[in-house]
Structures are given as C-alpha cells and as structure tokens.
Amino acid sequence: TVDFFIDRVKTALVQESNQLLGADLLIISSESIPESFATEAQQLGLSTASEIKFPSMNSNGDHNLLVEIRAVTKGYPLRGKIQLMSETSTTHGPSSTAISETWEIATDVPPAGTIWVDEKVLQQLELNKNNRIDVGATQLQVTEFIAREPDHSVGFINLGPRIMMNAADLEKTELIQLGSRISYNLQVAGDAEVVQRFRDWAQKRLNKAQRIEGIRDARPEIKAALERAEKFLNLAALASVVMAAAAIALAVRQFT
C-alpha cells in the first residue's frame, strides 16, 4: 500500500513537471520531422501535436517588433493549458494601456485566419482585438491575448515576444524559406511506460538534426528537484515501514 501511494505521488510529480514542457516528450529538429514518428506514437496509443517555431519581424503601423512565431496543430499543448486574458481585461492602444489580471483557459488552438499574441506583443505593437496585422505575405486577425503558456521559457530561454497561429496558415505566410531558423517540434504524451517505449523506438531513428527531450533533459533544475523529491519519498516509505514494524513489535510485547 505504501509503495502504491509513493508511486502515485511520483507519477503526479512528473506529470505536473511535464506541463512546463507542454508534453511528456518532445522530438525537436531543425528539419521537418518525418510522419513516421507521429504515426508510430499514435499506433502506440499516444497523443501527438506539432509545433513549428521561428523568428519573424512583425509590424503594426509605425511599430516594428521581432517576435517568435509558433504555428501549432490541434491538441497543442498536450500537457498544461494556455491562459488567455479575458475580453474585458485587454484595453490597449494609444489612449489606454491598462491590463487586468483576469484570464480564461483556452479550449483549442487559434482558428485558421487568426493569431493570438502575448502581452509583450500587445504592448509594443499597441494592438486591440480584431486588429489585422501582416504575418509574412498574409494578414491575420488578432482574436486573443495570451496571459501564460505552459512551455514558455523552458531552459530560461525564448523569453521574447510571441505570436501563436494555426499551422494551416503557415504556407500562405511564405515565411519558411531556405536558410530560415526553424525548430520543428513533435509533442507526445500518454502512459509513462508507453512513452518510454516510443522514446526507445525513436532514439534509434534520429538523425543529426534531431534530438529527444523530456522534462529532465530540458530543465536540469527540474531534474534535480524531482530526484530530491523521489529520495524524500523513498525515505518516507522506509520510515513508514520502520514505524509499522515498531508498532507491531510493541503490540506483540503487550500480549506476551
């Protein structure tokens, strides 16, 4: 019973930590990831989602800003939730810069034809909802403002302004060009043992442009914290066994 409880606590700790990654496992590549990886994961019963990240210069009138664009597919993120500023909390523009702390949970990714922007983009480009801004060769409509993302600042990098869009709109932006700095991410989530099986399978098929990351790989400080927590739980389990043995010994002495 004690071992079962400890295992449940360990599993919960890992799952909570994985929200910082947005998934249980990532395959990251500077090249397009072959469909075979997502197909294998899905055949094992795992959930998948894709994300393509790259820097881009965006503008609104006289305001220009270098941002990180994230083109995502349905299901993103697989762990954690995207928090959006509520409709009444975002009054921003030349005459108003007030932003309240109220927010709501996103239930999907941005619909095709729209984008979501974070607070830095909101402030520096002086945007309001329903503004249309140029994203490469197309225009997309701002429909939501992002308050928080589960995988923001993994490894304490990528802290710049961010725009999220639907991957279905990526081609018409014409932003993916030869020599572009692009990161292709495949998110995977599911039962821990099955995820490990997929990781073992994928590890044998990676090329030099690809790598696998779990939360312990991406965040060394999280790895250290998890290891300390696991040691504490193991000590707690040992202490429980010792206390139970002592209680049994005392009970036996009373009846002998």
What is the meaning of each model-derived region?
Residues 1-242, 248, 254:
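Membrane transport/envelope proteins' first extracytoplasmic loop
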